């Protein structure tokens, strides 16, 4: 409960006001078919956030949970939601919101896999797709809805999505969801849910303003917060290259590729125009490149992501659209062609490179004007970004 105060466990790595830690899936009192789905999905034992968050969520408590990118946040609320769903009740019982269509689709995929042996229906209600499909899904009955705020609110307003049986409201990437761009939509949706609805927020970062906002619609939440100065990404080697000025970045990128052998890489830029510029330039140098940004039609985005996942494209250039939650297994290198404008997006970007302990390398292109921002990032995450060594190629052999 909020009034209990925060205690530290695990040598200060985690702050929490909830003492129960469960070290095996078998001890979480889950439906046997969920455990079967968990093992089938490839999990052997719960991650740190799963050990602490699944139990209070399945007990119906409001939960504010924070963990690093790639530590199993999605499975945390997936397992919990599947446990709480009444399989005999065909109405919507759980609503999960995500900031991007891609993340919503990935969450749907995880729910489908872990819930493989349950009689549970899940539907992604996202912008850029046919409204007719949404309407048909809601009319036929769907127990878990994963969606983006705009489309979900539209379906509720049009009365196709009936919220009277919703008992769980889950926000993934809460720092992004509660930023100014989504806050109003979230509030509008929340006001249309039953007063007894359980609220669960999960995110990699929890700035103070977000923590304050959560008090408006959470009831004595269990808080499980990774201390900020421990919020570096294990397994990710972080480097910077001082390119001095913007005009030198492209030549630096080509020189870098001459010295390393990389299976696949994600390159982040801050604007759509920069993504398009860099894509054109790299294709001119005969690189196999894909590009993705928010203005692309949904079908095109899906095709591009599938091509990259299958390995037919070696370089994916993206804006921060991709930075939250998209798990591309083979990525060993992330390049910040531009440092993120928002330092809280840094962890989401470089987290693409080494999820669940897989090693990765992040290289930041830094102009003279960027040095201050890089120092801010280092301070914010209590980390050190080292100058790229001359023998960088050895890290990829």
Curated annotation (Swiss-Prot):
Its main location: cytoplasm. ATP binds at residues 67-74. SUPFAM superfamilies: P-loop containing nucleoside triphosphate hydrolases (SSF52540). ATP-dependent RNA helicase which is a subunit of the eIF4F complex involved in cap recognition and is required for mRNA binding to ribosome. In the current model of translation initiation, eIF4A unwinds RNA secondary structures in the 5'-UTR of mRNAs which is necessary to allow efficient binding of the small ribosomal subunit, and subsequent scanning for the initiator codon. Belongs to the DEAD box helicase family. eIF4A subfamily. Gene3D superfamilies: P-loop containing nucleotide triphosphate hydrolases. This is ATP-dependent RNA helicase eIF4A. A motif (DEAD box) lies at residues 172-175. A motif (Q motif) lies at residues 23-51. Residues 54-224 form the Helicase ATP-binding domain. It comes from Debaryomyces hansenii (strain ATCC 36239 / CBS 767 / BCRC 21394 / JCM 1990 / NBRC 0083 / IGC 2968).
